C-alpha cells in the first residue's frame, strides 16, 4: 500500500506557563516560558485534525476553587491574547477539527477541549481510566483537572486499547505503534513515563517525517545530552524509570531520518505558526 503524506501541518502556541528553566534541563535559575503547543494537520480524506489544545479560559475557570487552585499556583498560566485553539485555527485559515488526539490528560494539553463542541477525542484508554479513579486531590497532583472535560465527553470519545498497538519495524522496532488511519500518514506511538497513557505521534510529511514526542522530554538538548533531570522533575513523572527508557529508545533512532519535536522545547516553539503572538 502506498503511504499517504500530510500536505499541511503546523504547530501553534496555545498559551504558556512560567517555570524555572532548571526544571527542564538543569541549566540556570532563571524562569522561562513553557509554551503549551498544539499541532494541526490536514488529512486528505479526514480533513483537519488536532493534537492537543493548549490552554483556554476554561483552565482559569477550572482552577478558580480549591484544590484545583493549587495547580494554577504551581503552574501560573498565561492565555494567548489571540484566543483559544479554535479561534487561533480560524485566524490561520484552518477548518474546525473533526478529531482531536490527546497525547495525555495534563491540563496544559486538554485545557481547550471544551472549545470544540463537535470534535471527537482520540486517546489511549489507560490515560484517562487511571486518573478518573483517583480522589480529586490526587488528580490535581497528577496534573489532571476533570472540569476541563466537556459534558458528554464519553459520547465523543475514541478510547484506544493497548491491544491495538503493535511493535514497529526497522527504526521503530522498540516502540508500540498504531497506524491510526491505516494509510501510514499518522502513527500513534506509546511513550510511557511522563503520564498515564502518554502518546507521541509520527506525521508523514515532507521533507521527512516529524516525530512529535510531546512531553517525553521538555527540551531536546536535554534529551540529546542525556543529562538527568533535577530531582523535583523526576518526582513529577508518572514513572521515571519508564521515562528514561523511553528517552533511550528515542535516542537510538537515526536522527537523519526524521525531525524531532517536543511540546515545551524552545526549538519547537520557534516553529509555531503564531510564534510572534
Residue ranges and their predicted role:
Residues 1-76, 249, 255:
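Zn-dependent metallo-beta-lactamase
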Residues 4, 26-33, 123, 133-154, ...:
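C-terminal/domain-terminus segments
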Residues 11, 37-43, 49, 162-206:
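Core dinuclear metal-dependent hydrolase active-site scaffold
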Residues 48, 120, 209-211:
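Hydrophobic "anchor" residues on beta-strands that sit immediately upstream
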Residues 53-55, 105, 194-195, 215-216, ...:
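Active-site metal-binding loops of divalent metal-dependent hydrolases
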Residues 64-123:
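Active-site metal-binding motif and surrounding structural segment of the metallo-beta-lactamase
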Residues 72-87, 206-277:
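Cap/insert and terminal regions of metallo-dependent hydrolase folds
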Residues 77-96, 126-189, 235-257:
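Metallo-beta-lactamase
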Amino acid at each position: 500500500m502506498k503511504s499517504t503524506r500530510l500536505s499541511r501541518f503546523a504547530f501553534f502556541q496555545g498559551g504558556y506557563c512560567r517555570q524555572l528553566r532548571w526544571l527542564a534541563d538543569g541549566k540556570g535559575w532563571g524562569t522561562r516560558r513553557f509554551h503549551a503547543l498544539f499541532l494541526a494537520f490536514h488529512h486528505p480524506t479526514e480533513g483537519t485534525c488536532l493534537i492537543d489544545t493548549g490552554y483556554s479560559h476554561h483552565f482559569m475557570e477550572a482552577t478558580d476553587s480549591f484544590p484545583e487552585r493549587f495547580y494554577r499556583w504551581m503552574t501560573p498560566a498565561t492565555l494567548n491574547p489571540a484566543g483559544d485553539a479554535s479561534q487561533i485555527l480560524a485566524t490561520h485559515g484552518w477548518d474546525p477539527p473533526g478529531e482531536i488526539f490527546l497525547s495525555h490528560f495534563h491540563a496544559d494539553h486538554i485545557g481547550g477541549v471544551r472549545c470544540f463542541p463537535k470534535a471527537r477525542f482520540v486517546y489511549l484508554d489507560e490515560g484517562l481510566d487511571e486518573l478518573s479513579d483517583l480522589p480529586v486531590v490526587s488528580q490535581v497532583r497528577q496534573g489532571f483537572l476533570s472540569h476541563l472535560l466537556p459534558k458528554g465527553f464519553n459520547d465523543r470519545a475514541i478510547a484506544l486499547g493497548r491491544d491495538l498497538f503493535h511493535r514497529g519495524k526497522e527504526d521503530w522496532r522498540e516502540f508500540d505503534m498504531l497506524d491510526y488511519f491505516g494509510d501510514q500518514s499518522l502513527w500513534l506511538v506509546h511513550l510511557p513515563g511522563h503520564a498515564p497513557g502518554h502518546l507521541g505521534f509520527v506525521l508523514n510529511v515532507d521533507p521527512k517525517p516529524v516525530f512529535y514526542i510531546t512531553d517525553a522530554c521538555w527540551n531536546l538538548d536535554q534529551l540529546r545530552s542525556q543529562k538527568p533531570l533535577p530531582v523535583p522533575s523526576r518526582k513529577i513523572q508518572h514513572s521515571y524509570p519508564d521515562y528514561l527508557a523511553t528517552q533511550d529508545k528515542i535516542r537510538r533512532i537515526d536522527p537523519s531520518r526524521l525531525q524531532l519535536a517536543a511540546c515545551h522545547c524552545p526549538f519547537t516553539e520557534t516553529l509555531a505558526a503564531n510564534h510572534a503572538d
